[in-house]
Each structure stands twice: as structure tokens, then as C-alpha cells.
Amino acid sequence: MVSSFTAPSFYPSSHVPSLQAEYIGKSLCDINPPAAILDAAVLRRNCKRMLTATQTLGVGFRAHVKTHKTTQLAELQVGKDTKSVNLIASTVAEIENLAPWLLECQSQGKTTSILYGVPLAPSTIPRLASLARILGPGVLGIFVDHADHVKVLSEVDESTWPGRIPIWVNIDVGYHREGVPSDSKQLADIAYALSASKRVTLGGIYAHMGHSYGVSSPGEALSFFGHELEGLEQGAISFLKCTDAHATNDPNAEKIVLSLGATPTARAIQNLLSGEATESVEAYRATLDRINQSFAVEIHAGVYPVLDLQQTATRAAPSGPGANETSYDDIAFRVLVEVNGVYPERSEKSEALIAGGCILLGREACKSYPGYGIVTPWPAQEGRFYDPAGSKTGWIVGKVAQEHGNLWWEGPAENVRPLEIGQKLMLWPNHACIAGAHFGWYLVVDSEEEDPEVVRDVWVRWRGW
């Protein structure tokens, strides 16, 4: 079945056939910078690891789409053979653009669920209600962390929003972005409002441990995961007590979903399957199994398919069997730039200029090194590149203005990798979510193909809110 629904055109996307005609078949060295590059082989590998880990542990998985904002990568995140498509989005526009594919999934007999992952703003209700009518009852879930959210939704009639509206109660487990503490009166008030409403139903309990980005080892990431899981369990128990409901060990009863994760803690679960049966690993695995008997534990994450320098700095998970930690080979996203100027005698460090500043890369720091991006060894895959955990010798983006980026050589001057005006370079960005947002589309290559430099496809990113 082909859906007739199209997303509102206030932020129109670029014409895909024109982009494909322009780019497919070209080599990366012939592309005009700046450009956003994805490696499909790395994406497949990262997505497979996450799905394998959650399936092996017997927990659910919900893919966040905010990083990439593409249908193609959302499909990789959930897996081609899945029977359940569970997603979370940060903007209404993301859901609008996913709607045609979700309808296609429904026509194939797959169950679908998508959450609007920001506590409800009343102004979004008309667009969300329109989506709920298109997708069907119970598909679109709404975040709440205040009783007024429940009251606002309770005033929406069924002709506007069919069926009971699933709400996901957001528990604050220490990140202090959104959510309410598990022992708060505000959480109890949400529970009472839910009990009094005939229009909403409990979809699940949710937590996001964004401060897990500060971890520096697999063990530390697992510790954050355990804290997040137990905090979410406590919030769920407190909430259910106020609604006169309770968790159940009955295998035939429908369990309440507990959804937790950020990419570091979500990737940390791979360490539960690493084969190293340490006391701490066994304890975290036992906690997960215990809670999963009473609730339906679900992991959510978003940036893990593409990864970036912030994520490699967490060292939250190994890159594969026998590996100790994530490597640069696990980063699927790179930014193509061109050298605009060279300044070998400007200061103690050789410098160069690229036409790519904070508008291109963002201004978010990375704890493992003092810059905003690292120059990769592309295209020859030889020569020195800066490794925060190794030699710390190579080119980094050391300073950014709006459209200017200054490359700094770090390490001994005699080892400098010479740069020339007009030379094209690839950068690993600090934060893929921010750097990707500055582009209208990705150029997709595949390192498992005979020529890994050839553009195989163009994936257009959704725009707007």
C-alpha cells in the first residue's frame, strides 16, 4: 500500500532525483565541499550490534531518529525483519516525515509505535492529532511530566484524536533536563490526573540519562546503566502505587514498559554479553533480568548508528569481539571540507584554514581533546592523525568562528602532515547530531563495496520542527 500522506511543505526537502543524478557514481574526491558523508557499511554494523544485544538480553528496543532525520537509517535501526517498529522523535516534523513509511509498515502487518519525545506543548496538539488520525489509535505516544499535560490531553475529544492517548511519564534519574523525581509530589499528581481521565492511558515510563556522555570506560557506563534502570524502576513503582496498579510477574499479563537509555548506557549493555563474567557484570545482568520479569524493559538510543568523537570518548562499549573500546572505524559520519589557507609560520603550531566553522561543525567540546573536529587520514588512509588516547599528533579543528575553522597541528613540528590550498580533507565531528543538522542531505558510500569512495546514494534529511 502506498500512502497518500505527505508532510507539510513549510520546510520543503530537496528534490531527491536531482540530487541522485548529481552525485551517484561520483568519487568523494570529486565532490565540492562541504558535504556530509555516511558509510553504509559502518551504519549496518552499528545497528546490527544494538539489535543483537537487545534481542539476546530479551529486552525491547526503540530507535531515536533525531540524529539523522532520514527514513533510510530509521529502517536500518529497527531491522528489515522486525515485526515491531518502535521509534522516538524530537520534533513533530520527524513524525510527519515518518508517517508514510509507518503506514507502509502497518500494511505489512507490523505493529508501530512512535513517541513525541518532548513534554507536550499545547500548540503542537493540532498537528499531533492529525498524525494520530492518520496512524491510528494507540500509535502516537506523548511525553508528560506534569499533571497539566494530562489535563490538556483530556480535553481533546475523540473525533479529534481517536482512541485513548498513550502517555509516557518521564522520570528524572539525575540528568535534570525533563522529567520528575520518583519521590516527588509532581509524579503523584500525574498519576492522580491519569486515574481521573477518560481520554489518556499509560503507555510507559521513560528516562534519559544524558549525563552518561561523561563516562570514560565500559564499567562506568554500566554503572550509569544500572543507576538509570533502578531509578526508573523506583519511579514506576511510586507512580503505580498512586494509580492503585502494580507490576506483575504473570507471564500472560501485559507489562508496563520501562524505557531507558542514552547512547552510552544503551551501548553499555553490549558489555553484558562480552563473555567477561565479572562480579559487576553478573550483578547488572541479574538486576536487568529481575526488573524485566515485572516490567517490559526497553532500551532507546539515537546517535549510536553514526557515532562521533564524543561517543568514542565515553569508551562505553567495545567495537567488536576481542576489542577493548570503540574505535574511529566505528564512526560512520564524516564531513568533507577544503583547505582555504595555510599558515606554517603563524605561531608555534602550523595552522590552516577551512571554510567550515561552528555553522558547519557546531561549537560543542569533546572531553578527550581540545578541539571541534579531527582531520581523518583520508584519502590515502596513511599519515598521522590525532588520537586522543594515543600519540596526540595530527591536525585538529582548534578554533571556530561562524564560517571559518582554524586547523592546528598538534605534536612535534617535524612530523607535520603538509597541507595545501585546495586540498580536500575529511573531519570526524565532535557531535554528529549537531554537525548533521547543518546539511540538507547525506552522501552515502559503502566501505564494503569494491570502491569505497564512490557515492552510492543520497539520503535527504528532514527539516523543521
Tell me what each language-model feature is.
Residues 50, 56, 78, 108-111, ...:
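Alpha-helix-loop-beta-strand connector modules within alpha/beta enzyme cores
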Residues 62-218:
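Active-site-proximal beta-alpha core segment in soluble small-molecule metabolic enzymes
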Residues 1-30, 104-106, 160-162, 242-249, ...:
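Eukaryotic N-terminal low-complexity, Ser/Thr- and Lys/Arg-rich leader segments
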